């Protein structure tokens, strides 16, 4: 399918427009060229963006796609009416119908979607990120009582990226610990985790995929050998079943899907969106 240029235009950082737009575009088999244009908050800046959008349409022979999050009606409508593009307006699509339904007027504050720098949510998110970094790959067993979840699984099964995603996106304090051959020989989870077994959630992975990932890191090693990967995975799954630890396979799941499943399982008291 022909590729398109996609603009993310906002009066703030553009992160909301880009996040929303990318989640929609992921449904289609295209590889768009991304152009982010933040802080478009007056008519002069709007004119510059319109010129750029129309230039892309002329050069490529097809209309760009434009996701916008702009609260100023004049600026927003100018871009919508003067651009040779498919303009997808998040405020008109979502905010205006909500205003009608709630019979309330929205704040219409510039940057409101990402105005969290002074909020408690921002503080909680930073605390969660620091916690997850300090407790990555079994580095520390201190303060595990504070953990919302402790991810366990064999090395390279997706624990670290999932932990950081949970921290950054949802303010979840996620530690992660590798299950290693010494644990299998001892036939028990690490002793430091035993008091917090109810917080544990396991990740497993297909042996072929694990071998491929490990060979990228340590090619030709026993660590990456398919037979060793099969052994570690089988032992880890057996241990998690015996210990009553919920687990899932990360083989064909995105980080977002893994995180959503974990959140549904642990049901944290607090959650940041």
Swiss-Prot record:
Catalytic activity as recorded in UniProt: [pyruvate, water dikinase] + ADP = [pyruvate, water dikinase]-phosphate + AMP + H(+); [pyruvate, water dikinase]-phosphate + phosphate + H(+) = [pyruvate, water dikinase] + diphosphate
Keyword Transport appears in the UniProt entry: no
Binding site for ADP: 153-160
InterPro entries according to UniProt: Kinase-pyrophosphorylase, PSRP
Function: Bifunctional serine/threonine kinase and phosphorylase involved in the regulation of the phosphoenolpyruvate synthase (PEPS) by catalyzing its phosphorylation/dephosphorylation.
HAMAP family according to UniProt: PSRP (MF_01062)
Protein name as it appears in the record: Putative phosphoenolpyruvate synthase regulatory protein
Organism of derivation: Leptothrix cholodnii (strain ATCC 51168 / LMG 8142 / SP-6) (Leptothrix discophora (strain SP-6))
């Amino acid at each position: 399918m022909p590729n398109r240029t996609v603009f993310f235009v906002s009066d703030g950082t553009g992160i909301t427009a880009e996040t929303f737009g990318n989640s929609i575009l992921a449904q289609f088999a295209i590889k768009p060229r991304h152009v982010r244009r933040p802080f478009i908050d007056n008519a002069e800046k709007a004119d510059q963006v319109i010129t750029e959008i129309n230039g892309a349409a002329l050069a490529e022979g097809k209309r760009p796609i434009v996701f916008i999050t702009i609260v100023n009606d004049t600026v927003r409508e100018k871009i919508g009416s003067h651009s040779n593009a498919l303009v997808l307006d998040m405020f008109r699509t979502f905010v205006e119908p909500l205003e009608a339904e709630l019979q309330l007027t929205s704040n219409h504050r510039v940057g409101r979607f990402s105005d969290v720098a002074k909020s408690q949510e921002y503080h909680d998110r930073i605390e969660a990120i620091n916690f997850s970094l300090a407790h990555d790959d079994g580095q520390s067993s201190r303060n595990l009582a504070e953990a919302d979840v402790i991810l366990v699984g064999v090395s390279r099964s997706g624990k670290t990226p999932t932990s950081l995603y949970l921290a950054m996106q949802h303010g979840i304090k996620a530690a992660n610990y590798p299950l290693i051959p010494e644990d299998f020989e001892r036939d028990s989870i690490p002793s430091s985790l035993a008091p917090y077994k109810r917080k544990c959630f396991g990740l497993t992975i297909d042996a072929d995929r694990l071998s491929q990932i490990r060979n990228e890191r340590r090619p030709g090693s026993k660590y990456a050998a398919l037979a060793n990967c099969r052994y570690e995975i089988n032992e880890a799954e057996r241990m998690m079943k015996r210990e009553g630890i919920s687990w899932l396979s990360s083989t064909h799941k995105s980080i977002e899907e893994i995180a959503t499943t974990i959140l549904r399982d642990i049901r944290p008291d607090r959650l940041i969106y």
